[in-house]
Amino acid sequence: MTVFPTLGLLFLCQLLATTSAQRVGPQGPPGPRGPPGPSGKDGIDGEPGPSGLPGPPGPKGAPGKPGAAGEAGLPGLPGVDGLTGTDGPPGPNGPPGDRGALGPAGPPGPAGKGLPGPPGPPGPSGLPGGNGFRGPPGPSGLPGFPGPPGPPGPPGLAGIIPEGGGDLQCPALCPPGPPGPPGMPGFKGHTGHKGGPGEIGKEGEKGSPGPPGPPGIPGSVGLQGPRGLRGLPGPMGPAGDRGDIGFRGPPGIPGPPGRAGDQGNKGPQGFRGPKGDTGRPGPKGNPGARGLIGEPGIPGKDGRDGAPGLDGEKGDAARMGVPGEKGPNGLPGLPGRAGIKGSKGEPGSPGEMGEAGPSGEPGIPGDVGIPGDRGLPGPRGATGPVGLPGPIGAPGVRGFQGPKGSSGEPGLPGPTGIRGESGDRGPAGVIGAKGSQGIAGADGLPGDKGELGPFGPPGQKGEPGKRGELGPKGAQGPNGTAGAPGIPGHPGPMGHQGEQGVPGITGKPGPPGKEASEQHIRELCGEMINDQIAQLAANLRKPLSPGMTGRPGPAGPPGPPGATGSVGHPGARGPPGYRGPTGELGDPGPRGDTGEKGDKGPAGQGIDGPDGDQGPQGLPGVPGISKNGRDGAQGEPGLPGDPGTPGAVGAQGTPGICDTSACMGAVGASTSKKS
């Protein structure tokens, strides 16, 4: 236990001894300022000191302006199709849409009739129609073959002869009489005249619809009709069942940076850190005052190049410069590299079910599906109500070709035809008589310049001509190429101190400092105390060994100014200067002698002159011979015509002839039905 107090006492004594030995005396008065010495070499950069404790957070800066919207990112890949959800309950039927336009007729169905449907139930009897008007007598038919002998009929009653007429009339009712002897088979009576068409009876009540017949053979798929008008939006259906969770989509575009957070609470004041290393040397001092100009000396001869001098000794360390004011804000840094893709996050909780969206527009009707297999016949359904009138049927079969129509009126003259190709060259015609002299044509364009002829012999010198007028100033020539860079000049005087820059953007708040504790103090000062104890122990073991190099002392006073040097040797030749601007054009020189006339050049190629005036109108042409054109192709079948109106009532026909045998046959048939 007594070792630690003694070591601590020795450590304190050593610290006091070292500090007292390195004390600096009082600073003397400043001496006169000497000429600036040669600039020393840059010292070796010291190692960066440990980062200091984070300072207190600054005040909260003003919110920044929102950044401009970034460019649109690349479109994401299409997502994987989700699983098909369960079908929702069918919605209520919407109101019937408007009737669409009639589509084109479909291709004919396969040959053959469909399977016959089962017979429907008999409909209710219609109301008896009114008696029709008797039509005109028809043409007499051919006599028929004699029929087989019929069974003996009952004896008939005595006929009634009406007054004023010789025609026999059938009684309203023929009651059966006692059986008579079998009579001879009679001959077939004369066929009566064909009666006229009776009056159209009233339309009977529509019978109850029969059961639906079996489905026929499915026809081929018809052409798709035009798209119908958009129907009224149906009522909103109930919300469907929730689908399965889809696959995770690609990551979206990163959003804009969030706003700066609120200023945090001020952290506890940190401990004072250890003293840092010596900083870098300060900026170079201002140049000294300019000396007096010496008398010009006699230029001496160029001396030989001297041997390179030895490197000078390292100068004293420069004093610490005054800390400069805060400079302007630096340029924005380069954009950082894209970060590593983050790990896949946990699947988010399923969101709440959203409200059902509005019904979408009705889709384009799809193609007719493949006909399915014939199903089993279902039970007979109840008789349904009378349906709405069906759509207009398909157009009828194409009619026969009608007779050839009369020739139509001559058509309008057609458009001018395309100019035909040039025909083969015809035989040479007979040379015609010489025509009258035409009007002189327009002057042709000047021909191309002929080739330069050979130079003639030099002629006699002519008289000197008069001095010509000063020509216009020529265009300024292009700038010459840039010369080699010159020798750098002397450094100029240091500029004035700049104005204080705009306060910079408040930095992000640093992490909160650690709380003051014994462990924290040991972490900061433990290594330094261990080094001091190790050095103290080494000095105690070797008291005669030289100690550590002390800190450099303060700079001494400047020395006296040196003598003025002699005139130096002339420097090396400088680089060539920049090319000057092009000078103005000089006065034109005297006119030269006229040369001899050259040889005649080759004939120039003429250029087609402009088109001449339009000639007089020619004689009328020979009238052409017209021919009937070919019959046009058969037109497409027309639309079905409107149903015709009922015709007028025909004239009343002549009274018919009643055959008693026919009446008897009718009575016999009625009795057989009753039995």
UniProtKB/Swiss-Prot annotation:
Entry PTM: Prolines at the third position of the tripeptide repeating unit (G-X-Y) are hydroxylated in some or all of the chains.
Start and end residues of each stretch annotated as Triple-helical region 3 (COL3): 25-515
Biased composition (Basic and acidic residues): 301-317
The keyword Cell cycle appears for this protein: no
Region annotated Nonhelical region 3 (NC3), chain positions: 516-546
Signal peptide region: 1-21
Chief location: secreted
UniProt region (Triple-helical region 1 (COL1)), positions on chain: 632-658
Biased composition (Gly residues): 126-135
Nonhelical region 1 (NC1), as annotated region: 659-675
Compositional bias (Pro residues): 27-38, 51-60, 105-125, 136-155, 173-184
Compositionally biased residues, Low complexity: 62-87, 218-233, 361-374, 481-508, 569-582, 613-624
Subcellular location: Secreted, Extracellular space, Extracellular matrix
Sorted UniProt keywords: Collagen, Extracellular matrix, Glycoprotein, Hydroxylation, Repeat, Secreted, Signal
Region of interest (Triple-helical region 2 (COL2)), ranges: 547-626
Domain of life of the source: Eukaryota
One Pfam assignment: Collagen
GO cellular component: basement membrane; collagen type IX trimer; extracellular space
Locus of motif Cell attachment site: 242-244, 591-593
Its biological purpose: Collagen type IX is a minor cartilage non-fibrillar collagen. It is associated with type II collagen fibrils.
Family annotation (PANTHER family): COLLAGEN TYPE XIII ALPHA 1 CHAIN, SI:CH211-266K2.1
Quaternary structure, from the entry: Trimers composed of three different chains: alpha 1(IX), alpha 2(IX), and alpha 3(IX).
Protein's name according to its UniProt entry: Collagen alpha-3(IX) chain
Gene field: COL9A3
